[in-house]
A protein has these predicted regions:
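Beta-propeller blade termini
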Residues: 1-10, 30, 55-65, 119-128
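Gly/Ser/Thr/Pro-enriched helix-cap/hinge segments flanking short amphipathic alpha-helices
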Residues: 93-95, 102-258
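Short glycine/acidic-enriched loop and turn motifs that connect beta-strands
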Residues: 23-25, 78-80, 141-142
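Short consensus segments that form the blades of beta-propeller domains
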Residues: 18-20, 48-51, 86-91, 165
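Hydrophobic beta-strand segments that make up the repeating blades of beta-propeller
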Residues: 11, 15-20, 59, 71-75, ...
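Short, conserved, GDST-rich strand-edge loop motifs in beta-rich repeat architectures
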Residues: 74-92
Length: 258
């Protein structure tokens, strides 16, 4: 039901993660860069533990700004769960959500403590503090706003908002010039029946004070914005960056400013 698209393994190719019904595993499709995808679900530890659950909203996000993309999945059954029905639960469809923490490419699972009939998941930085928060919608239940209070002391970040008057910014790609293949798609869609923050946030590794950012706009033009300070948001306006030849692939231009 749900889908999220990002380059989770930092190989410059977009990957897909899709949620499914109970008795099926959710699926991670690893992009090969030539229009083909391979099923990498079990290789990255995302298969067996998802089987008992019906997944809906899902998004990749770097919750602790360590530079790795973690994964959150909102679950809720569509068929009566017998144990809950016998207990007299009004809507016996409640399931726990799943938080998958990226540990060097393989995901370890943290289960939510509460059960709900989960459906939508939107992400964004609601308090502008540089880490990603989540909003979950539940059928027959209250929405849940989860404010990120993870200790990210010593980890830097940079946030980017694109501005292209008279043109769409959705579908554009933002890449850090200081780290090859660290990129994000500007998107509000995906997940399930949800719309997320259009800004992108990167966790920064290394002892940098500033970084360059490369933007491939939705019309395929490419610009480089130099020496942006860390630990703050920047609004990048189309036409004010340094032009980059449009046939140059993302990942080929990198500059480090300290």
């Amino acid at each position: 039901m749900g889908v999220t698209a990002e380059d989770f393994d930092r190989d410059c190719h977009t990957d897909l993660f899709i949620t499914h019904l109970a008795a099926e595993t959710n699926t991670l499709y690893r992009g090969a860069g030539d229009g083909w995808f391979s099923d990498a679900t079990n290789v990255h530890g995302l298969g067996l533990a998802s089987t008992p659950f019906t997944g809906f909203g899902t998004r990749w996000l770097d919750f602790d700004n360590d530079g790795d993309l973690d994964l959150y999945t909102v679950n809720g059954s569509v068929s009566r769960l017998q144990d809950q029905a016998l207990q007299g639960v009004a809507y016996p469809l409640r399931q726990r959500n799943q938080f998958w923490v990226n540990e060097e490419g393989r995901y370890s699972l943290v289960m939510s403590s509460d059960k709900a009939v989960g459906r939508g998941l939107a992400i964004g930085d609601i308090d502008n503090d540089g880490d990603i928060d989540m909003l979950i919608t539940n059928s027959h239940g209250r929405p849940q706003l989860l404010r990120n209070t993870t200790d990210t002391l010593g980890r830097d970040w940079i946030g980017i908002e694109l501005n292209a008057p008279g043109a769409l910014t959705l579908g554009s790609t933002v890449e850090l010039g200081s780290q090859e293949c660290v990129k994000a798609i500007v998107q509000t869609d995906g997940s399930y029946a949800s719309a997320s923050d259009h800004r992108v946030v990167f966790g920064i590794s290394g002892n940098l004070l500033r970084t360059d950012v490369i933007v491939r706009w939705s019309d395929s033009s490419v610009e480089q914005f130099g020496r942006l300070k860390l630990n703050r948001y920047h609004s990048l306006r189309k036409g004010r960056g340094a032009p980059v030849p449009s046939d140059l692939e993302l990942g080929a231009v990198h500059g480090v400013s300290q």
